[in-house]
Every structure is written in C-alpha cells, then in structure tokens.
C-alpha cells in the first residue's frame, strides 16, 4: 500500500455541520490520512455542504464549482448531499463521492473506495446515526470553546423547514454519553461548552419518554467547566424544572436562545410551529422574572406567505416591548418539499427585504442600549484571538455566543483560551471594548 492521500475539508453551514466535519477529520486522522487546511495541496477535498435555505445552497454550489474548476477530487457531504444526491453526481463529474448526513462516519471507507476508482453514493434515505463520545473528533473551533451535540434530528414539521427531511427524526444521546464527552473536552482545556441540537428543550424525549434537559444540565453542572451555554431552547420547553436547573447550576450561563420565528398567532399557525399561538408576552415576561439578568437571543422570519402589514406590525411591537439582547432576522425562503412552498400569497422579495430592514433598524438601538449597560462593569471574557496587526485581544463575555453575537475587544495581555476579568469602557450596538484587569 502506497502513501495515503492528503485530505482537506471545506466546512459550510451551521455548528451541527461543524461537529460532523470534526468527526470526519477525527476518523481520517485516526486512519492515518494527512489532513491539510490548504485545499490546493490536498488530493481530495471534502465539502460539507449546507442546504437550509437558498443562500446557503448558493454558497455550497459556488464552493463546489470553484473546486471542480481546479480539477480537485471532490467528496460532497452534508445536507446538500442528502437533498440533491442525483443532481450533484450528474452535474459534477469531479465528484468522486456523495455522502449523506447519516453516513459521514463511514468516510474512511468512502475514501478507500474512491481510491480504487469507484464513484461512491452513500445516502441513507432516513438518517439514524448519531456520533458519541467514542467517535474520534478533531476540533476546528478556537481552543477555549467546543460544541456538544445532545441530540440529532427533529420531530416537528414546521411548514417552512426542510431539516427533518435532511437530518431525520430526533435521536438523543444518553446523559452518561454527553457527560463523558464533556469531560473529554474539559481535559483538552475547553472553557465553554455549547449544547446544541435541533430542539434542545426536547432533549431525551425519544429515549426517556419525557424531556430530560433539567437532569442533563444538573449532571453537566458537576463538571469542572466555567461556562455551559444552550442553543435552540423552545420557550414552551423551558419548564419550571429547566428554569430551576439553570438558576441552580452555577456554570450554566443565563443565556437563552429562543427561535421564536414570529409573534402573531395566525402566522405561527400557518408556520405549523408547535406552540401555535402560545408565544405571547406572558412566556417572555415569565422567563425574565424567573432568570433575572437572562440574556435573550431570538430569530424571526419575515415575509412568510400571507403575512400582512398588520401582522408584521404586531411583530415590530413585540420586539419593541420585550427588548431582546440579540435578534436575527431572515426573509422567508421557499423550500421545495416543504408545505410553505405551495402556500398562496407569497410575498415579493423586495417587501420581505424591506420588512427585514425595518425590524433590524428597530432592534439596533435596543442592542446599543443593552451593550451600554455593560459599560463600567468588570466582566469575565473568554479570550479567543489576538489581532496580529494591532495586538488587541478578541474574546466574548457570557452575553455573546460565537459567530452569531458580538465580541469583546480587549487591551492588555492574556493567554488565548482563558477566561479573564475585563473592565468594559465603551460599547457600540454590536461589540464591547475593555481593558484586562491586572491582578497586582
């Protein structure tokens, strides 16, 4: 057997996709393959694609075309491979393999088969696989932070969303498995663990018969990691038990990522959101009272088919009233294969864009005000990078999640991957600026 080929991975899409990328890297390294970050030097490039909305697919296609033009042997993995396997093979002769979301753990045998000249298609119709703490993993995040998947797939069928088709139904890992992986991450020096799944508040429902997020948080609270953050918490799943676990577990950050999508009950019904009209003022106020100082992030979809100006105004007033810390806004993307694709009264893109801009313009002064409230405080900051030109450190406080929220720009010296006290001296609508607090 000659020398094994070198492999690069181009990662696109969400942090769930990132974990798949990290497991593929871990499996390849364990099998003796060279992994290179430089795609030009690699024999094979694995493109872990995203297919969530049109813009994500366009980015995936651009990447694939660029690599094809460079005559690279391409292995297509991820959601787009799951979604469009036949078209991809037809249109990209450079693709030596297409691997679905439930099959990436077989990546080593895929490369071996491709090396023998086979064109490999490995796409399970219904993905059922989920990696655990025994699956090799090679992290690609900054050294202080790691994502930890507690479950994969989704049992809900929201009208606009194709994820259940791409990722399968929910399958949770056991509490023991998650704790074991968390301990491995802490041993690697991780300071912040971010729990992810499609619906984190439904964690455990499929294997325990009821959600077990509160028990999971308490179990993770016994691990020596400074920060545990949750993403994708449905407000209706934030039960008194879960809220108590957040309050009583010191290393669980009071950061709630609530994918609300809209405020108007009729729009929520059209979206087939699981709580229908129960997203209301009471739920948000209850959370604020139960967890004082909670940082609230949410996302909204504007321009859902049939959304009236009055319904959009309802959303504007809702955002104005509740003053979320962070808001992400997407315009509706009609996805073939979803019920919303065929709904009447699809809105023109310019109307959707204008509504997105109005909502973001409303949120900006709120975000600015929230950040101004941090000025003068000394806050804990996880230092993640150093700007090579200015020497400034860049990190995040507990208010900010990676990639989606702001950052803290810090003067002073500190070791990367550590959490240090920083005195905040100024802020804009996105970021904070501060100085390392010396211990003299």
Curated annotation (Swiss-Prot):
GO terms for biological process: tRNA modification. Residues 140-370 form the Radical SAM core domain. GO terms for cellular component: cytosol. It is found in: Cytoplasm. Its cofactor is [4Fe-4S] cluster. Its main location: cytoplasm. [4Fe-4S] cluster 2 binds at residues 154, 158, 161. Keywords: 4Fe-4S, Cytoplasm, Iron, Iron-sulfur, Metal-binding, S-adenosyl-L-methionine, Transferase. Its EC number is 2.8.4.4. Residues 372-438 form the TRAM domain. GO terms for molecular function: 4 iron, 4 sulfur cluster binding; aspartic acid methylthiotransferase activity; metal ion binding; protein methylthiotransferase activity. Residues 5-116 form the MTTase N-terminal domain. Belongs to the methylthiotransferase family. RimO subfamily. Catalyzes the methylthiolation of an aspartic acid residue of ribosomal protein uS12. This is Ribosomal protein uS12 methylthiotransferase RimO. It comes from Nostoc sp. (strain PCC 7120 / SAG 25.82 / UTEX 2576).
